[in-house]
Amino acid sequence: MSNETKCPFNHTAGSGTTNKDWWPNQLNLNVLHRHSALSDPMDPDFDYAEAFKKLDLAAVKQDLHALMTTSQDWWPADFGHYGGLFVRMAWHSAGTYRTADGRGGAGGGQQRFAPLNSWPDNVSLDKARRLLWPIKQKYGRNISWADLLILTGNVALESMGFKTFGYAGGRADTWEPDDVYWGSEKIWLELSGGPNSRYTGKRELESPLAAVQMGLIYVNPEGPDGNPDPVAAAHDIRETFARMAMNDEETVALIAGGHTFGKTHGAGPASNVGPEPEAAGLEEQGLGWKSTFGTGKGKDTITSGLEVTWTSTPTKWSNDFFKHLFSYEWELTKSPAGAHQWVAKDAGEVIPDAYDASKKHRPTMLTTDLSLRFDPAYEKISRRFYENPAEFADAFARAWFKLTHRDMGPRARYLGPEVPAEHLLWQDPIPAVDHPLIDAADVAALKAKVLATGLSVSQLVSTAWASAATFRGSDKRGGANGARIRLAPQKDWEVNQPVALAAVLETLEGVQKAFNDAQTDGKKVSLADLIVLAGAAGVEQAAKNAGISISVPFAPGRMDASQEETDVDAMAVLEPVADGFRNYLKSAYKTPAEALLVDKAQLLTLTAPEMTVLVGGLRVLGANVGDSKHGVFTDRPGTLSNDFFANLLDMGTEWKPVSAANDVFEGRDRATGAVKWTGTRVDLIFGSHSQLRALAEVYGSADAQEKFVRDFVAAWNKVMNLDRFDLA
């Protein structure tokens, strides 16, 4: 008997040919079930915000300060200070953020997991996190990895003489990788022009991506596809930083400020570097990129393959970056690893060596550094910063704070004693509650007033959904709080049907004014609250029409933001290109509509059952954009019935595509051939996809009406309150 046949288990659960292998285009619902309690080791009642409030932040920072200059033999500190390494670690933790879908960023501590922990741009950051383990171990659950990575970057800056803008905790850890689209390439650092390239046309970067190559945070420091052209590189810099919410001034400040510290590493050829952490052997214990070049560390370190130290004070804040940038002419050269970089012509040796105090080097720069001089717009900003060091320091402090906090959402989530007092426009500020809130009696009276206006169930539900469904669980932006649906740009979005929306808002504002004017104790209802309350009234009326009495939960406390408190450009990225819940597609896309529905559901933090019940309910409530009849599988719209599911699953109906793109379908009576319904891919997927059909069967059963209403109300209430961090 062979050794193989002696083993009772030749294969284990999860191995073998998968459904994805057989049907690569099958709709993937797994993204809706990430980060559940099943992967979370914390106790069910663990509250990270409360745990962080108990943390002695000053003590943690003191330990981090000590760590900065406590060099370890197993991974020595450049210049005797880990500051540069930890700035890079924090930057790369936050720098995956992108505005298009709000994904990436520092929240969750995703740098610990694949693929980020093994990206070529993150070489050696495995060592940075391992250096932090004794401190994380010491403070345990009271500080997450996500918060610690950013705090360490701040302390690194402070330990090198820089005054930061502030720090906020509140990033709870996740315990498994996010399922994020990072690109279609199959090779790390694959150049543009390949079969899976993220570029089309004249270097047009695919949305929602915000990096130029697979495995990079932003740009290739050698230039586009390794071409050492600073002007061409400026195009890539501007594109990628803009997609991370940074303007030109913030971009210059971040590059110059970050490159004031530390160095890059390219002591020898990349062929000496071993596999990344996810591919390394068990004995490496989660570390990767083991190098056989010399000692493999210290002066022999290979990270990016570039060997650049920008300033004469790499462990101290200074204006040296700009001084060197503008004081010298630059000559193209190569690092010991063969990477393109630049050296100052006719310059003296003024740059210290990281490990030999007797050695000095000429100033060096990256291709992307020189972009700050040779791109006209960047050059103008760079010279201003060079001539005004205090302005540069302030710009870097603010840009660094934005970089490291952009994905945290509103200030209500900020924790700790170092939260800056200043409110910033990119935080989507909302005024604090400054009046008594409505009570249960007021809620009941306002619902009656709303229903008496003559606004339909469809109008009430559509408006509330449009207001709340801008929320993104990725970066915690959007939502009903602030009532920004009445402001530019949201009021003008096609999906919100501007003319119809304006009429509904005008009516609700009349109800709001009448109520507020009648109060004698200062009590008020905000329009943000009233929009949600009106939606609740519509849902309750629709349930009543179905013969079921139910109360939709409601918690007052939302406030109305002003146009001045709204960054129109930053808010524009929240405009949905698709909203399957309203059967809306802005344009034709390569991605199927049903996949865009799942993507939207994931951003709304919905599960597959929640997504299913919401689609079925919103269809019969008439929430489709443009009053489209696609998917309205009922003869009693405005009634919260399970008709969508019952009629979709009816075998008396035969479906056929009626559009060339197979995106619109007719359902005909099998016996008579008469058209009964029309639907989109988003509608029919609930009968076609085996998992979604199983869910549809639950809600389409004869005994499901009450459960359907109850589940719809629960999912509806969840969406209405996604941005209510004040209730947590």
From Swiss-Prot:
Highest taxon above the source species: Bacteria
Cofactor details (free text): Binds 1 heme b (iron(II)-protoporphyrin IX) group per dimer.
Reaction catalysed by this enzyme: H2O2 + AH2 = A + 2 H2O; 2 H2O2 = O2 + 2 H2O
Site (Transition state stabilizer): 88
Pfam families, A to Z: peroxidase
The protein's name in its UniProt record: Catalase-peroxidase 1
Enzyme superclass (EC): oxidoreductase
Residues forming the catalytic site: 92 (proton acceptor)
Alphabetical UniProt keywords: Heme, Hydrogen peroxide, Iron, Metal-binding, Oxidoreductase, Peroxidase
Function: Bifunctional enzyme with both catalase and broad-spectrum peroxidase activity.
GO molecular function, one term: metal ion binding
Binding positions (heme b): 259
Necessary cofactors: heme b
Keyword Hydrolase belongs to the record: no
Site of covalent link Tryptophyl-tyrosyl-methioninium (Tyr-Met) (with W-91): 218-244
Coiled-coil intervals: none
Family matches, as InterPro entries: Catalase_peroxidase, Haem_peroxidase, Haem_peroxidase_sf, Peroxidases_AS, Peroxidases_heam-ligand_BS
Organism (species): Burkholderia orbicola (strain MC0-3)
A cellular component annotation (GO) from this entry: cytosol
A GO biological process held by the record: hydrogen peroxide catabolic process
Cross-link (Tryptophyl-tyrosyl-methioninium (Trp-Tyr) (with M-244)): 91-218
